[in-house]
Amino acid sequence: ETTLSLSSANADEVIQKRILAKNNGAQNFLEADYPNHENDIDSMLVFEDSPELRLYNSAQNYADVYPFVPYQFNLLANSLTQISKHSIQGANLSRGERSLLAFFKETAERNADKESDALVSLDQFYPSLEKWLNETDNAKVIKQAEENSRIVPDPDDQFNIAVLKVLFMIKYVDQNIKPTLNNITNLLIRSVNEDKLALRKQVEMALKILISENLIRQNLKSFVFQTDEEQEVTRLINNIDLNETDVDNKLAVDIFDANVGR
């Protein structure tokens, strides 16, 4: 198998040739089908404050990279590079022992039986990443979430976990994509015919659940995956009992001290 550096500028070209090449019939079908979805895709996949995330630029480009979306090549490469810098096991990624090619190959194979309108969402790359995270703290956070009945009340519904996986995968690349509600929703789109409004509402509910379980935190418009250490800090902050009377009394003392020149 060809080893493909995570920083390869031509990563998408290599992946297209090695993994995504299609026979003439499939290529022609996808190119002919693209105009039926072009406007919907362009209006659906609008990222906030993330200008470098590329979308399809032609019918041929759509057919060439299908079922993936162009932004995924650079975003995944950057994500894996940063994850490798934040975990010991993940260091294997940056040494080329795990090629970007393999991530796309395995994910394509997992989606081989999907309908022709299906797209790959970012969380669907996670099973390939999980093998290398092994027993890292971040992998344990997700594994424990999968066993939490408040997060997964129905074993057949793993959507809340999918949201958590996406937030982990983009945790260290906020220079590439801001983890806003809209952007998170975009990363979870799995069809060219996706009902984005319904998906957005589903994501919003998932975020509330994950916040209540202290697995993520909200920072203004952004939602951030929390490591074990960050969860502990959040717990300590939340356990500080500071009522309005305490604040008023402290403020009064400060004003008094200032007035009398203490």
Predicted segments with their positions:
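Residues that form generic nucleotide/phosphate-binding pockets
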Residues: 14, 18, 79, 103, ...
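Short secondary-structure boundary/capping segments
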Residues: 1, 18-23, 82-83, 109-110, ...
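The catalytic "switch" region of P-loop NTPases
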Residues: 1-50, 209
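Short alpha-helical scaffolding segments that buttress acidic/His motifs in well-ordered protein cores
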Residues: 15, 76, 164-167
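C-terminal helical "lid" subdomain and adjoining coupling/linker elements of P-loop NTPases
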Residues: 26-32, 40-162, 173-180, 190-199, ...
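Amphipathic alpha-helical transducer elements in NTP-driven molecular machines
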Residues: 8-12, 70-73, 204
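Terminal-proximal interaction/regulatory segments of ATP-powered molecular machines
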Residues: 146-262
